[in-house]
């Protein structure tokens, strides 16, 4: 079968880093090509070379059989290559229709915007995706999952021959994911080629026909998905066997460290639970259940309206994140790019940002040598892949950014570490490293709250699990009691079992 798009022998280097070396990718009509690899394997760089954001150092790009070079995203888009980025590219203050047709609005014969036609066309695109809202709604009023669907509608509006989807289901619910897969199958039947970049093995085996594997910037293999197993695909990605996906540390927790009684706040209603020293408490639930809101109330990022929190026997009041940090509670956000990291700053500056008091002299000046030593130690301990600590953190892969975010939290020497979706957007190899770090923190007596939408992760890593449903606690289970079935039953409100200590 002749490929719609072919990239062969692609090289791309940056100062101190060879991002791509002999990389290759084929996209076929009517087929979904998965592009997989650990974070830092070169997937994003390849997409930027393809769409003309980066100029390739070597190699060829064939589009519809002809050698081509795109000068930027506009030229690749006009040629018929659409891309849906992992980071949303929408304007919250505009309506859905205005976002979809931004820069190419429908105009009438008087040169004025034809709003009626524009909204009608946008509504048709939303209907194709089986969405329940109209296109006159403001994008800022939508959930992250619904905003992602608007991004997909925007690309569909270009009638692209090849559509690149970068982690498209990262923020989608199961229902939204099913809608997306239905649309992908429709696009396949129309002869379009799709590049599907994802870390989610289940999705790759469900929706993709072929898979291309990258490792360390190099092309490893192109295979039909049907010829592979999850294990064999992961082994190709990481270059080694993954014996134990979730390395649980079997060590009994200590005394109660954190006690939460009848906590209320925005999206949180009357929640009570305990957390022990050296314990990993998993927090499960569906999107919108109030898990993140609970953590933010606890940490001080959202206001507490009632309830009590005690830490090591002393009552704690957190009116701001600064109060949370001062009391030894650290929150690592699920949205590391918005809440967690300053992308234009260096690895060193990001890592030490909240711990500068430990590196400050009485007069306020910094002990730079101490700061550099601490950052260097964490880079080594966490195996952060970066050319130097002065590298801008925005240039690191997702897994390495997440390690820096966690290291920054630990630099403040916390008693309670809240990890909200710590492995979201992180590849299988980096996930294992993060799990091993979590176990190390547990062994050191740190109390950890692990919020995750991935049930196997919660089940595999936690000593005890609480489940949220519509702002309430709907279940509490020991490691032995917990199964995917009971967690899901509690998450949808069908089961209510809370064992308070």
From Swiss-Prot:
EC numbers: 7.5.2.7
GO MF annotation list: ABC-type D-ribose transporter activity; ATP binding; ATP hydrolysis activity
Occurrences of domain ABC transporter (ranges): 5-241, 252-495
Recorded catalytic activity of this chain's protein: D-ribose(out) + ATP + H2O = D-ribose(in) + ADP + phosphate + H(+)
Signal peptide: none
Membrane topology: Peripheral membrane protein
One GO CC term on file: plasma membrane
Pfam families listed in its UniProt record: ABC_tran
Localisation: Cell inner membrane
Keyword hit for Metal-binding: no
Keywords: ATP-binding, Cell inner membrane, Cell membrane, Membrane, Nucleotide-binding, Repeat, Sugar transport, Translocase, Transport
Keyword check for Oxidoreductase: no
Enzyme class: translocase
Gene3D superfamilies linked to this entry: P-loop containing nucleotide triphosphate hydrolases
Stored InterPro entries: AAA+_ATPase, ABC_carbohydrate_import_ATPase, ABC_transporter-like_ATP-bd, ABC_transporter-like_CS, P-loop_NTPase
Amino acids binding ATP: 37-44
Taxonomic superkingdom: Bacteria
Family label: Belongs to the ABC transporter superfamily. Ribose importer (TC 3.A.1.2.1) family.
Biological role: Part of the ABC transporter complex RbsABC involved in ribose import. Responsible for energy coupling to the transport system.
NCBIfam families, A to Z: PRK10762.1
Quaternary structure (record): The complex is composed of an ATP-binding protein (RbsA), two transmembrane proteins (RbsC) and a solute-binding protein (RbsB).
Protein name: Ribose import ATP-binding protein RbsA
Lineage: Bacteria, Pseudomonadati, Pseudomonadota, Gammaproteobacteria, Enterobacterales
